[in-house]
C-alpha cells in the first residue's frame, strides 16, 4: 500500500473523483486500508494511464496478470507482500530492475544537497542528479520574497542588496549544483509570462520595491520576470545548462483543500493561457545577442502543443539539432 500510494497525488485525484473519504487518501488510515480503497476504484480507471501503469507494475515486478479488483485485492496484497520481503524490493531495487540509468530531482537554489552528496559516496546503478529550480526568486510579488532572498544570501554566502547581486548568488548556487551532482538542466515554472521591455534601472527599482514589501503593478511584475528569465537564460548558456520551461502551471486550485492537506497533494492544474508571444520575444532577444541556451518547452495545456511546436521550430541553430524543442 505504501509503495503504491505514498505521495502519489495522481492516484489521490482518482480516489477523490470516486468519492473516497480523505481519511483513506491523505488521512490517518493505514496503508493497508488505503490500498483496499484504491483497489475498489481501479477497475473504473480503464482508459486512464494509471490503470495501465498499475497493470504493468503488477506484471513486471510480481508476474501477476490478473487485473486488481476489490474481489482479489487481499490475495494480491498477500502475494506482493511476500515477494517484496523475499526479494528485498527496495526503491533502488525497483529502479535497477527497470533499467533506470538516470533520475533527476528538482531542488531550490538554497538546498544544501546533503542527500545528493551522500548518494555520490555510494556506488549505485542509477545516477541521481537534480534540476536547478529558481522560481522563488522570480516571483517577486510573493509575500515571502524578502525572506527567501535572506535564505539565498545565506546559502550563497554573500549579501543580496540588488537584482545584480541576486543574479550573482544564483549563478554561484547553480555552479554548486553542477559541482555536486553534475547537473546541466534548469526547471523554471512559468504560470504566466508576458514579455515587457525594461531598463536595468527600472528592474533594480522594482527589486527594491518588492524586497521592502511594496505592492507591484502587473507591468512591474512583467518587467521583473522578463529581466529575470532573460538573465537566467544567459547564465544557463554560459554554464552549458539546458533551460527547461514548464509553462501554464496553475497551482493550488482548491485552496480550502490545500489548507487542509497541504500543497502538492493533487490540486494543481494546467492553465489555458498560452504565452507564446511572450516566450517568443524572450527567445528572440536571447538569439539576437547570441546567448540562447538549449531549451526544452513543456506546455501543460495539451491543446496548444502545435502552437508551441511551431514556435520552437523557428529557433533552429546552425550545427545544433532542435536547439529549442518540446
Language model feature labels by segment:
Residues 1, 242-252:
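Histidine-centered catalytic micro-motifs
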Residues 1-239, 291-309, 313-326:
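Metal-cofactor-binding active-site regions of metalloenzymes
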Residues 268-280, 301-309:
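A general structural motif
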Residues 252-255, 305-306:
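Flexible glycine/acidic-rich beta-alpha junction loops that bind and position SAM and/or redox cofactors
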Residues 282-288:
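Short, basic/hydrophobic alpha-helical segments
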Residues 258-266:
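Short glycine/proline- and charge-enriched loop/turn segments
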Residues 258, 289-290:
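Acidic/His metal-coordination segments adjacent to aromatic residues that form catalytic metal sites
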Amino acid at each position: 500500500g505504501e509503495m503504491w500510494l505514498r505521495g502519489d497525488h495522481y492516484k489521490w485525484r482518482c480516489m477523490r473523483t470516486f468519492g473516497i473519504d480523505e481519511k483513506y487518501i491523505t488521512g490517518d488510515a493505514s496503508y493497508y486500508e488505503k490500498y483496499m480503497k484504491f483497489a475498489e476504484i481501479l477497475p473504473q480507471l480503464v482508459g486512464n494511464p494509471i490503470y495501465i501503469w498499475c497493470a504493468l507494475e503488477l506484471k513486471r515486478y510480481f508476474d501477476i496478470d490478473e487485473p486488481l479488483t476489490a474481489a482479489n485485492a487481499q490475495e494480491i496484497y498477500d502475494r506482493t507482500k511476500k515477494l517484496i520481503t523475499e526479494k528485498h524490493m527496495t526503491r533502488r531495487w525497483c529502479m535497477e530492475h527497470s533499467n533506470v540509468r538516470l533520475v533527476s530531482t528538482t531542488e531550490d537554489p538554497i538546498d544544501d544537497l546533503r542527500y545528493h552528496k551522500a548518494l555520490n559516496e555510494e556506488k549505485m546503478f542509477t545516477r541521481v542528479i537534480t534540476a536547478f529550480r529558481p522560481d522563488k526568486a522570480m516571483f517577486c510579488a510573493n509575500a515571502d520574497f524578502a525572506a527567501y532572498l535572506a535564505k539565498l544570501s545565506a546559502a550563497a554566502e554573500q549579501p543580496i542588496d540588488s537584482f545584480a547581486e541576486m543574479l550573482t548568488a544564483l549563478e554561484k548556487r547553480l555552479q554548486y549544483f553542477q559541482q555536486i551532482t553534475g547537473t546541466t538542466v534548469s526547471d523554471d515554472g512559468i504560470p504566466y509570462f508576458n514579455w515587457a521591455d525594461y531598463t536595468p534601472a527600472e528592474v533594480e527599482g522594482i527589486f527594491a520595491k518588492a524586497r521592502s514589501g511594496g505592492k507591484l503593478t502587473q507591468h512591474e511584475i512583467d518587467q521583473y520576470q522578463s529581466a529575470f528569465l532573460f538573465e537566467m537564460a544567459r547564465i544557463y548558456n554560459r554554464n552549458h545548462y539546458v533551460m527547461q520551461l514548464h509553462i501554464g502551471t496553475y497551482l493550488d486550485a482548491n485552496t480550502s483543500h490545500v489548507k487542509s492537506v497541504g500543497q502538492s497533494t493533487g490540486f494543481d492544474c494546467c492553465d489555458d493561457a498560452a504565452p507564446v508571444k511572450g516566450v517568443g520575444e524572450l527567445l528572440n532577444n536571447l538569439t539576437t545577442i547570441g546567448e540562447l541556451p538549449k531549451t526544452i518547452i513543456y506546455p501543460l495545456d495539451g491543446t496548444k502543443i502545435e502552437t508551441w511546436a511551431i514556435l520552437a521550430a523557428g529557433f533552429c541553430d546552425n550545427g545544433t539539432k532542435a536547439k529549442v524543442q518540446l
